[in-house]
A protein has these predicted regions:
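Domain-length accessory/inserted modules outside core catalytic folds
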Residues: 1-127
């Protein structure tokens, strides 16, 4: 299955993943949770459902249609296809790969200020 892997403090990358529950759990380091972003473009974000409880490193912010942060994913996650008319995950299309590589292109750093989470994109040297 063609996926986009997103790890804390790293740029996302395209890779292949066996289409099995065990492979998905190994990929995120535990039991999985499926998250659908607003306007998710027929894709699902698969993360460790205990990432925050296990104090895994914060990874990327999820935003609503207005660009406001509504959640932060802790630990590694991947994006795969999730057709609305199917219960199975699928490979991403070329268009989905391009979109999700851009969507999560920059690693993010998080700071809590006055009960609000501030997200700072991390620029690579020379950018």
């Amino acid at each position: 299955m063609r996926i986009i892997m997103v790890e804390p403090e790293r740029r996302p990358y395209e890779t292949e993943l066996e289409d099995s529950l065990g492979a998905m759990q190994r990929c995120v380091g535990g039991t999985i949770e499926v998250v659908y972003e607003p306007g998710g473009r027929g894709a699902a974000l698969i993360c460790n459902d205990e990432g925050k409880l296990l104090n895994l490193p914060l990874n990327r912010a999820l935003r609503d249609e207005k660009g406001e942060i509504y959640d932060v994913i802790a630990g590694p996650f991947f994006i795969c296809g999730a057709p609305p008319d199917s219960e199975n995950f699928t490979s991403l299309t070329d268009e989905q790969v391009d979109y999700w590589l851009r969507r999560f292109a920059k690693p993010e750093f998080f700071v809590r200020v006055n009960d609000k989470v501030i997200c700072v994109p991390v620029e690579e040297p020379g950018q």
